[in-house]
Curated annotation (Swiss-Prot):
It comes from Anaeromyxobacter sp. (strain K). Residues 183-328 form the KARI C-terminal knotted domain. This is Ketol-acid reductoisomerase (NADP(+)). Involved in the biosynthesis of branched-chain amino acids (BCAA). Catalyzes an alkyl-migration followed by a ketol-acid reduction of (S)-2-acetolactate (S2AL) to yield (R)-2,3-dihydroxy-isovalerate. In the isomerase reaction, S2AL is rearranged via a Mg-dependent methyl migration to produce 3-hydroxy-3-methyl-2-ketobutyrate (HMKB). In the reductase reaction, this 2-ketoacid undergoes a metal-dependent reduction by NADPH to yield (R)-2,3-dihydroxy-isovalerate. Pfam families: KARI_C (PF01450), KARI_N (PF07991). InterPro entries: 6-PGluconate_DH-like_C_sf (IPR008927), KARI (IPR013023), KARI_C (IPR000506), KARI_N (IPR013116), KARI_prok (IPR014359), NAD(P)-bd_dom_sf (IPR036291). The gene is ilvC.
Length: 341
């Protein structure tokens, strides 16, 4: 069982004595910067030259510097830019300013675990990862609550790495809900597996296949969309609220019986075997190498997939149906910038 830390376990004063730099101002970056600022921490934001986020950050009352300037000034540096850009930014703008005793933080362990970023031995390296999107991290903080999170230490040069991580987690509100102790290896590998096999890859493939089966059988695309994609949120929300048992308690007996007797025929032992293969590819670094090489080549495979998926009939049908749903338009407006990639 994981060790869980709360407000009482975290000394925010430890962070208030230091200067913090948030590198990036996207979904997580804006939430971290604003929550830390409101917790009384000395925060600055580091952005690339010409970043569109500069005006947003300054409009929120934050001090904006270049990544290099922010890294030079700060004692604690949180890297919140995309995985594929971290190595270059780190090598060119952060590493030259990592003097002894500083702390380097990440919200995802990819580049540390797969040795793309190689910090010097005399700095602390740790992970603080809220388990929710940035707008929720911010909203919960403002409401006096918090999002559960993860904390991990990769390198403890000062003897205070975990304490700094817990202080940071408290500053953004996570220790209000609880912060689970983990490792860079566990966070990285389970996060990638969840994305690929279940949350993104698995769910998207299941939805698309279900849609295609119904349309190929002669049913209207609109009906197929409702049954295989739109209503998925209803089921996921129930699982989110109370697990599989609550979902099954909340649906009809017909749906529950079909769940038990037909679900394992769709996602069966063969699917589980493929999941194991995917996990091994992650553990062995094969996926990381593939993704790194893809980005070094300019992302041609990703571009082909994006174009092909955008042209799938489910997208056109979905757009027409979502235009009928005013609450979806309102939700998208509420969760827009700064929540972009």
């Amino acid at each position: 069982m994981a060790t869980i830390y709360y407000d009482k376990d975290a000394n925010l004063d430890l962070l208030k004595k230091r200067k913090v730099a948030i590198i990036g101002y996207g979904s997580q970056g804006h939430a971290h910067a604003l929550n830390l600022r409101d917790s009384g921490v000395d925060v600055r934001v580091g952005l690339a030259a010409g970043s569109k986020s500069k005006a947003k950050a300054e409009g929120a009352g934050l001090r904006v510097l270049s990544v290099a300037e922010a890294s030079k000034e700060a004692d604690v540096i949180m890297v919140l830019i995309p995985d594929q850009t971290q190595k270059k930014v780190y090598d060119e703008e952060i590493a030259p300013h990592l003097s002894k005793g500083k702390a380097l933080l990440f919200a995802h362990g990819f580049n540390i675990h797969f040795v793309q970023v190689r910090p010097p031995a005399d700095v602390d390296v740790l992970l603080v990862a809220p388990k929710g999107p940035g707008h929720m991290v911010r909203r919960q903080y403002q409401d006096g609550r918090g999002i559960p999170g993860l904390v991990a230490v990769h390198q403890d040069a000062t003897g205070q790495a975990k304490a700094v991580g817990l202080a940071y987690a408290r500053g953004i509100g996570c220790t209000r809900a609880g912060v689970l102790e983990t490792t860079f290896k566990e966070e990285t590998e389970t996060d990638l597996f969840g994305e690929q096999a279940v949350l993104c890859g698995g769910a998207a493939a299941l939805v698309k296949n279900g849609f295609e089966v119904l349309v190929e059988a002669g049913y209207q695309p609109e009906s197929a969309y409702f049954e295989c994609l739109h209503e998925l949120k209803l089921i996921v929300d129930l699982m989110y609220e109370g697990g599989l048992a609550w979902m099954r308690h909340s649906i009809s007996d017909t749906a529950e019986y079909g769940d038990y007797t037909r679900g394992p025929r769709v996602v069966d032992g063969r699917s589980k075997d493929e999941m194991r293969k995917i996990l091994k590819e992650i553990q062995g670094g094969h996926f990381a190498k593939e993704f790194i090489l893809e980005n070094q080549a300019g992302g041609p495979t990703m571009a082909r997939y994006r174009a092909a998926e955008a042209a799938h009939p489910i997208e056109e049908v979905g757009k027409r149906l979502r235009d009928m749903m005013s609450w979806i338009r309102e939700a998208k407006k509420d969760s827009s910038d700064p929540g972009s990639r």
